[in-house]
Every structure is written in structure tokens, then in C-alpha cells.
Design a protein with these regions (language model features):
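Conserved beta-alpha-beta core of the PfkB/ribokinase-like small-molecule kinase fold
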Residues: 147-217, 236-239
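Alpha-helix C-terminal capping segments
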Residues: 58-67, 112, 273-278
Length: 316
């Protein structure tokens, strides 16, 4: 469990971030050899840690100094209790995290290769039972928030409705389109910012993103889908960003990769808090890149989320 005193920052003004998204337990193992079909390999260890993109981003935003409310669903089981306890320890408002006895808590099975790159299988469990409770909770919270973070880990009707309601209120909607599926394009018109990684950008556009030129081509397609700003997370390369009047690229800070799990969530959290604080698009991307770089230097998902002071120190 995190040492809250050392990772959370006290700000004169703390923006309020609403995260509506997935809450999972992570089962993580590493191996020197990714198995071929029909092949059995040996894992080096097994770690059971809290995760889920929504929960990871909530923790990341909290450590960046924001006040954070999380809306989602867990199972009424041992993993659910563990997930809830960790969120509480991180200072997250979990009054609208619902326990459901009809499904088990979501699980992510994560395989790390020798370079720290991850391969993930999700069993969404209770996340997929999110319904009108989550929609109503979001409607009550939205008038007071400075930004909304969403992903694609809950049922489409929930994520789409929450994004639409926030859009009507003029609240910045930051959309992380993962996991990728054909539902994503129904949410995009209600998002202000879409933040795919390279694989997700390729899924949405058909463009294989390997450099700034291909990122620019993919961004042009995404902008035509109705979103106003595109930020493509490009791992160790950095991030490309584009809006109607601005585009650019921010390089990642070189760092030894230990575990790439949740690096994108760290990026998204730092970026969203920066947008809520009215920083420029480029400055928000710079903070996102710094947070992502710091996250890959540690093992785990929520445990690797950096503190605000670490992010600021890295880019100063």
C-alpha cells in the first residue's frame, strides 16, 4: 500500500478530476521467453497488485495533487476489498465505487517480457455490470469537476452517456481509447482529447504509427472523427499532439525500463491534471511524458504512479 504522505502533494488550488472507468486486480508475471502457440514457459514471479485503467488514472491524478472522485464497480469479493482499501489509502473519493455480488472483480492477466514490455488479457467481470447507478452518480458529480477521464473498460452506454453529459456542460473530456474495439468511434465525438497509444491509433485509423510523420497522418484522421485534440502516446519515443491551431512532438526522457504496465495511465493522469490547471497543450504533454517515463522505472501499476514533485523535477 502506498505511503500517502510521501507521494501526495499539497496544492494551493487542487482541481477536481472525475474518473469513470475500470477497476481491476492485476496478476503479473514476467518471463524471458514469450510462449509460442502450444508452448509452455516458466514465469519468474507472480505479483498481485491493484490496477484497472480507471483506478490507475485516479491514483495518478491524486499523486499529481488533484482531488479525485472515481466511479466504477467491483465484485463483492476478496479482491474487491483489496482494491477499495488501496483507493482509500490513496485519498480517492470512492463513495460511487459500487460492490456487486453478481460478478467477480475485474482481473487483468499481465505478461512482461525481458524488456519490460507488457501483454495484457482483461477479464472485465463486475466492470461490465456498470449501469444507471454509475450514470446517475456522474450526473451528480459533473457540475463541480474540472475534467473528466474515461476509457473503454465499462459498457458503451455508460461511457458514452457520461461523456455526452460532460460535453454538454463544457467540461473537458479526456478519452483513453483502450481496450480497442469498434465501440470507440461512438464516444469520440463527445471527447475533447483522445489519447491513443500507437496500437490504438493504428486500430482506429489503419495507419501504423512509428514516427512523427505517421503520427501526423493518424492524427488527421482522428480529428475528422469529431475530436478537437489528439495526443498519440509513442512509448519510449515520446508523444505527438495536434489540435486545430497547434501541433508538435515531445520526446520521452531516457530512462531504464523496468515495467511498462500503466505508463500510459501515468501519462494520462498527469496530462489531465495539467489541462484542468489550464496549462498549455504542450506543457500538459510534457508532464505526461515525464510521468510516463517515471512510471516505467518501477514495477507495478498504481505503485509506479509518480508524485507531482518527481514529475516537475524531471522536466525542470
Amino acid at each position: 500500500m502506498a505511503d500517502v504522505e510521501t507521494v501526495h502533494e499539497i496544492l494551493e488550488y487542487s482541481p477536481l478530476i472525475l474518473v469513470v472507468g475500470g477497476i481491476n486486480i492485476n496478476l503479473i508475471t514476467s518471463t524471458d521467453l514469450i510462449p509460442e502457440p502450444g508452448q509452455t514457459v516458466t514465469g519468474n514471479n507472480l505479483n498481485i497488485t491493484p490496477g484497472g485503467k480507471g483506478a490507475n488514472q485516479a491514483v495518478g491524478a491524486s499523486r499529481m495533487g488533484a482531488r479525485v472522485s472515481l466511479i466504477g464497480r467491483i465484485g463483492d469479493d476478496q479482491y474487491g476489498e483489496q482494491l477499495l482499501a488501496n483507493l482509500l489509502a490513496e485519498g480517492i473519493d470512492v463513495r460511487c465505487v459500487y460492490k456487486d455480488s453478481d460478478a467477480k472483480s475485474g482481473i487483468a492477466i499481465i505478461l512482461l517480457d525481458k524488456n519490460g514490455q507488457n501483454y495484457i488479457i482483461q477479464v472485465r467481470g463486475a466492470n461490465m455490470l456498470a449501469d444507471t447507478c454509475e450514470i446517475k452518480a456522474a450526473q451528480e458529480c459533473l457540475p463541480d469537476v474540472d475534467a473528466l477521464m474515461i476509457q473503454n473498460e465499462l459498457p458503451l452506454k455508460v461511457t458514452k452517456k457520461v461523456a455526452k453529459d460532460a460535453n454538454v456542460l463544457g467540461i473537458p473530456v479526456i478519452f483513453d481509447p483502450a481496450p480497442s474495439d469498434n465501440n470507440i468511434k461512438e464516444i469520440i465525438p463527445f471527447a475533447d482529447v483522445i489519447m491513443p497509444n500507437q496500437n490504438e491509433a493504428e486500430f482506429l485509423t489503419g495507419i501504423k504509427v512509428v514516427d512523427q510523420v505517421s503520427a501526423r497522418k493518424a492524427s488527421a484522421i482522428l480529428l475528422k472523427l469529431g475530436v478537437s485534440t489528439v495526443v498519440i502516446k509513442m512509448g519510449e519515443l515520446g508523444a505527438y499532439y495536434e489540435s486545430a491551431g497547434e501541433s508538435g512532438f515531445v520526446s520521452s526522457v531516457p530512462i531504464d525500463v523496468v515495467d511498462s504496465v500503466a505508463a500510459g495511465d501515468a501519462f494520462g493522469a498527469a496530462f489531465t491534471v495539467s489541462i484542468a490547471e489550464k496549462l498549455s497543450l504542450r506543457e500538459a504533454v510534457k508532464k505526461g511524458c515525464a510521468a510516463g517515463s517515471l512510471a516505467v522505472s518501477k514495477s507495478g501499476a498504481q505503485m509506479s504512479m509518480p508524485a507531482r514533485s518527481q514529475v516537475d523535477s524531471l522536466i525542470s
